[in-house]
Structures are given as structure tokens and as C-alpha cells.
């Protein structure tokens, strides 16, 4: 019989790994999937509003436009007001097409306008494109 802690561990692993495992399976036939790690530096006092915009609008709009949301994080000691997240795409071309569609989506434009009525949320965005190594579980 499994102990309570083992059951909780198994449930947590299933919850956190299933989106990634599903994406990896779906992408198995793709030749060159691309990952993008994006770091947003929020303006002072704006991180909560930025997180709310992602929670309430951006994540769903990314999905709508063909982007795979891998995960979203903030540093434990977040002195720089950072949000870090990873998106995945079948190719670099698909990424560009998805972001173009996302940017022109009226729902995004409305959410952006509403969230910035008291000032811009983000002062800097840094992004980097990644591809899996031959020994990575996610490629």
C-alpha cells in the first residue's frame, strides 16, 4: 500500500509532467521544434498587474494562436521584478506566424490597452531561442 506522501508525489508528478509529456509526444514527428525562453522585467510596482494579464488573458491567447505554454516562473528572490516563461513551437516559422496572429488579435489589443492604462507594465523583454540536445528529454 502506498503511503500518503507517495500518493501526493505521484499526483504532483502526473500534474506537472503531463503537459510536457503530451507536447513531446505530439512533436515527435516534427523535425526542428523551437523553444523560446522569455524574461520580462516589470516596471516597479507592476509585476502583479503583469502576472494578472498573463493569468487572465495572455496564456489563453498564446494557446489560441498555436503556442505551447511550457511554464511560467518568478525568481524566489525577485529583486528585479522578473517573469520568466518558456513557449514551444513546431518551427521558427510557426513561432513568427503565431506571434503575428497574437499581436493582431483584438482580444490581446483590448487586454493590453486595459492593463496599461496606468502605465506600461514591462520595461524590458529578453528572449532566447533554444533547441533540445540529443540527451534532453524535451527536444
For every predicted segment, state its role.
Residues 30-34, 77-79:
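Short, flexible turn/loop "capping" segments at secondary-structure junctions
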Residues 29-32, 52-70, 89-130:
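An amphipathic, aromatic/His-enriched active-site/gating alpha helix that lines ligand/cofactor pockets
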Amino acid at each position: 500500500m502506498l503511503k500518503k506522501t507517495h500518493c501526493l508525489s505521484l499526483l504532483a508528478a502526473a500534474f506537472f509532467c503531463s503537459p510536457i509529456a503530451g507536447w513531446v509526444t505530439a512533436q515527435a514527428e516534427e523535425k526542428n521544434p523551437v523553444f523560446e525562453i522569455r524574461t520580462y522585467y516589470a516596471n516597479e510596482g507592476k509585476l502583479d498587474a503583469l502576472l494578472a494579464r498573463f493569468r487572465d488573458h495572455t496564456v489563453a491567447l498564446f494557446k489560441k494562436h498555436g503556442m505551447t505554454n511550457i511554464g511560467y516562473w518568478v525568481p524566489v528572490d525577485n529583486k528585479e521584478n522578473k517573469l520568466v516563461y518558456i513557449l514551444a513551437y513546431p518551427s521558427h516559422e510557426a513561432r513568427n506566424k503565431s506571434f503575428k496572429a497574437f499581436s493582431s488579435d483584438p482580444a490581446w489589443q483590448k487586454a493590453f490597452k486595459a492593463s496599461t492604462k496606468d502605465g506600461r507594465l514591462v520595461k524590458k523583454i529578453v528572449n532566447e531561442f533554444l533547441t533540445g540536445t540529443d540527451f534532453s528529454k524535451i527536444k
